Amino acid sequence: VDQVREVVRLRKGMTDEGLSESAMARGFSTLRLFKRFCDSTGVDVILPIATSAVREAANGPLFVDRVAREIGISLRVLGGEREAYYDTVGALNEVPLVEGSVVDIGGGSVQISDVRDRSFRAGASLTLGALALTEEFVEHDPATEDEINQVEEEIARQLDAIAWLPE
């Protein structure tokens, strides 16, 4: 089995207007590379998934449309709970977790899932990814105490909003 991996960081530089031109260019370049790889290795079915950056970007639908027109790939944009579900399925195939939580920390978002009897019970996607928090709250390197406090408050605020999450 061949494996290709590329870190794109679509969220980097995202503003209220959406994904930046440079981020979209990185995305297009990577998707073209993956498409060429799939075509050259005889892959019949491609199931491309877009997650938090595209889901949350004001111009996410434009990005999806351009990918379809320019590259010939139909991106599926996952909702946050669905993303948490797929993270859980992947985790349960790797670890013997019976009850507990699965947490996937990405650049843009964090998916957290409740697992009972080795089954997905509930999930949520939070805008608590490392890049999202840094771009929102941190201007200094290293971060100031005030910036760290703001990040901690945002994490607590978003976690408190999940009704099924234990205290």
Write out the residue ranges for each language-model feature:
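Nucleotide/phosphate-binding catalytic cleft detector across ATP-hydrolyzing
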Residues: 1-105, 113-167
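Conserved Rossmann-like nucleotide-cofactor binding loop
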Residues: 108
